[in-house]
Swiss-Prot record:
Binds 1 Fe(2+) ion per subunit. The gene is F3H-3. 2-oxoglutarate binds at R267. This is Flavanone 3-dioxygenase 3. It comes from Oryza sativa subsp. japonica. The keyword Oxidoreductase applies. InterPro entries: DIOX_N (IPR026992), IPNS-like_FE2OG_OXY (IPR044861), IPNS-like_sf (IPR027443), Oxoglu/Fe-dep_dioxygenase_dom (IPR005123), Plant_2OG-oxidoreductases (IPR050295). The lineage of its organism: Eukaryota, Viridiplantae, Streptophyta, Embryophyta, Tracheophyta.
């Protein structure tokens, strides 16, 4: 083991070999077909992936390659800006509508620069987004709008798969928040054991991830080991979030994942995080609670998550989901 680990715990070190996890690939276009048998099969495939793994990839999702490439380009150009421009958005206040920062926290050596900003309703938040590079607002907005459509389609299918109906709390989903986490992970040497982002699960209901190259790892539940996610052309990666586990009363489990650094090239990732509005409480669906399956989680909101995070900034064990278990 290289002594360049800089105090990284053994379980956090990047995987040394490629072990692709079982990765369901869902053709999302089939949800829109008139054939109810095909739709039912896709809904069942999504339900199984959420239940067994907590992640899957989608193709034929309706976002053009040019829109995806434009978002990656806008992100890449932002991170190439001089530091004095990027630092205009620097803040330790996690409630800022736009926030730029770099990661080296929790006593673990991490290498990441990120820009986070809200994206829905777009008319409320676009004015706060970076004006440099000139393409940023236009290209990123196109992607934000289209990926949100994908998220709503997925939410309908997941709720249908849970047996509570695709219209369940539809208005709350449509009026909910969207947060874009735009990340840049540097290229590193093979001997560098720094990671990009430590192991974590995502808050919110769903995260849809677009990446420029390989670097995502997930915990495979069957072996309790890290697995490298292979990069599929034109695919989006979907993560189940903490709030989905709460809403499903534990029928669906959030996925633990991390970002590792790529020795071939710098990596851009765009995580679009979707959930209820800031103060809207998420609780286990009453249809999924009974004597055999009592309520397992306390109701909570995205604002509750922010308060928990703020209160536990220096605590390496600040697992929000664990704090919700009853």
């Amino acid at each position: 083991m290289s002594d360049t680990s800089k105090g990284i715990p053994q379980e956090q070190l990047p995987s040394q070999e490629l072990h692709p996890p079982p990765m369901p690939v869902i053709n999302l276009g089939h949800l829109s077909l008139d054939d109810p048998t095909v739709r039912s099969r896709v809904v069942n495939d999504i339900a199984k992936a959420c239940r067994d793994l907590g992640y899957f990839q989608v193709i034929s999702h309706g976002i053009s390659q040019s829109v995806m490439d434009g978002a990656i380009e806008a992100a890449s150009e932002f991170f190439k800006l001089p530091n004095e421009i990027k630092k205009e958005y620097a803040s330790d206040d996690i409630r800022q509508p736009v926030r730029y920062d770099t990661s080296s926290k929790d006593g673990i050596s991490m290498s990441r620069a990120f820009l986070k900003h809200y994206a829905h309703p777009l008319c409320d938040w676009l004015q706060y987004w970076p004006q440099q590079p000139p393409i940023y607002r236009e290209y990123m907005a196109k992607y934000a709008v289209e990926v949100r459509v994908v998220a709503l389609k997925l939410m309908e299918a997941i709720l249908e798969g849970l047996g509570i109906g695709k219209e369940y709390m539809q208005e709350k989903f449509e009026e909910g928040l969207q947060l874009l986490s735009v990340n840049c992970y540097p290229k590193v040497s093979q001997s560098d054991t720094s990671i990009g982002l430590a192991a974590h699960s995502d808050y919110g209901l769903l995260t849809i991830l677009l990446t420029s190259c390989q670097g995502l790892e997930v915990v495979d539940r069957s072996s309790n080991s890290w697995k490298v996610v292979q990069q599929l052309p034109h695919a989006l990666h979907v993560h189940v979030g903490d709030h989905m586990e709460v809403l499903s009363n534990g029928r669906i489990k959030t996925v633990v994942h991390r970002a590792v650094l790529n020795p071939q090239e710098a990596r851009i990732s765009l995580a679009s995080i979707h959930g209820f509005a800031l103060h809207e409480k998420v609780s286990s669906a009453k249809e999924l609670v009974d004597e055999e399956n009592p309520q397992k989680y306390k109701e909570n909101s995205f604002n509750d998550f922010l308060e928990h995070l703020t209160a536990n900034m220096d605590n390496r064990q600040r697992n929000f989901l664990e704090s919700l278990r009853m």
